[in-house]
């Protein structure tokens, strides 16, 4: 008998420290007016010095257990998507597993930058459809603030910290299947390589690429990609499911920049009321943004929802779901 994947619970968490635009304007060449005009962002949340990615992810995992009524021992897999892990090793997912006492679960991290939640959902779906795993957590968590160069306004004003996640469960009822279709892609030739957080781990990386421990992005290129290539992927996936954009209850995009979301909405000829967003309050929380926005509207879902995200790699993915 075939096994299907049902999305049964969502959770989200942001750390308590709120940073508004004026606070950033006090330490870099920017202003509240400039940030809001170019990004739509008003505030973002930053983790405390002793608060790590695993701490945020653990908060979400505990919410998923509470909402589902499952014991931690019932979890088979914990998959954490992040580009700000607590360490290179062990996986942040392993720390979450220990924190919640999910002794029967195996755990690993997935790195697909801001596309992590869509890649994570698609990956978890395959584990469940194998018939061997019943209860899977996919948690996207980031502490981007610890990776910022606060002299670089082209990056620092965008990012915030947060976590969101989903509980996926096996079902033999095809009517309960939540993951309808997916399209995941990468363009490695568009990658900007730098040594980043791992520092120059090879002589080639140390010699040939820009040296920085902070995030680095080419904003104009990302904007162009996100507003042209990504909508093409979205349209193709919608058509493959024999739907039209107007059939969607919601479209939840990567929370990179409100202006990008507005351009995608115009491209699909859909009103912004169909685009739940949190970027204005939380900033770009990387892979967590889509999960957090979905968590906000999860209890209201009655129709199909398109999730789409894009990030470094370039990695980009769209997943069509229903509750």
Swiss-Prot record:
It catalyses: malonyl-[ACP] + acetyl-CoA + H(+) = 3-oxobutanoyl-[ACP] + CO2 + CoA. This is Beta-ketoacyl-[acyl-carrier-protein] synthase III 1. It is an enzyme of class 2 (transferase). GO terms for biological process: fatty acid biosynthetic process; secondary metabolite biosynthetic process. GO terms for cellular component: cytoplasm. NCBIfam families: fabH (TIGR00747), PRK09352.1 (NF006829). Keywords: Acyltransferase, Cytoplasm, Fatty acid biosynthesis, Fatty acid metabolism, Lipid biosynthesis, Lipid metabolism, Multifunctional enzyme, Transferase. The gene is fabH1. Its main location: cytoplasm. Belongs to the thiolase-like superfamily. FabH family. Pathway: Lipid metabolism; fatty acid biosynthesis. It holds the Pfam family ACP_syn_III_C. The active site is at residues 114, 254, 284. Coiled coil: none annotated. It is found in: Cytoplasm.
């Amino acid at each position: 008998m075939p096994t299907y994947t049902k999305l049964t619970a969502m959770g989200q968490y942001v750390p308590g420290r709120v940073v508004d635009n004026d606070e950033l304007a006090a330490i870099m060449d920017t202003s509240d007016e400039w940030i809001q005009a170019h990004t739509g962002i008003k505030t973002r949340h930053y983790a405390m010095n002793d608060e790590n990615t695993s701490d945020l992810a653990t908060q979400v995992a505990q919410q998923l257990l509470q909402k589902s009524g499952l014991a931690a021992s019932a979890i088979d897999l914990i998959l954490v998507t992040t580009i700000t892990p607590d360490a290179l090793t062990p996986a942040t997912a392993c720390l979450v597993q220990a924190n919640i006492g999910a002794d029967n679960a195996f755990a690993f991290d997935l790195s697909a930058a801001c596309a992590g939640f869509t890649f994570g959902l698609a990956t978890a779906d395959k584990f469940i459809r194998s018939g061997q795993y019943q209860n899977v957590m996919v948690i996207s968590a980031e502490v981007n603030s610890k990776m910022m160069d606060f002299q670089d306004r082209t990056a620092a004003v965008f990012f915030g910290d947060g976590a969101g996640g989903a509980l996926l469960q096996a079902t033999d009822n095809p009517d309960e299947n939540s993951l309808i279709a997916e399209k995941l892609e990468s363009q490695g030739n568009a990658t900007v390589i730098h040594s980043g957080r791992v520092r120059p781990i090879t002589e080639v990386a140390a010699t040939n690429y820009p040296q920085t421990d902070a995030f680095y992005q080419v904003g104009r290129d990302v904007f162009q990609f996100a507003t042209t290539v990504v909508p093409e992927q979205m349209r193709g996936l919608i058509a493959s499911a024999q739907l039209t954009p107007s059939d969607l209850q919601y479209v939840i995009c990567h929370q990179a920049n409100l202006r990008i979301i507005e351009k995608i909405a115009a491209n699909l000829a859909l009103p912004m009321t169909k685009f739940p967003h949190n970027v204005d309050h939380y900033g770009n929380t990387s892979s967590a943004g889509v999960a957090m926005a979905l968590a906000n509207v999860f209890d209201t879902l009655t129709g199909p929802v398109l999730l789409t995200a894009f990030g470094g790699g370039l990695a980009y993915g769209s997943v069509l779901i229903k509750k």
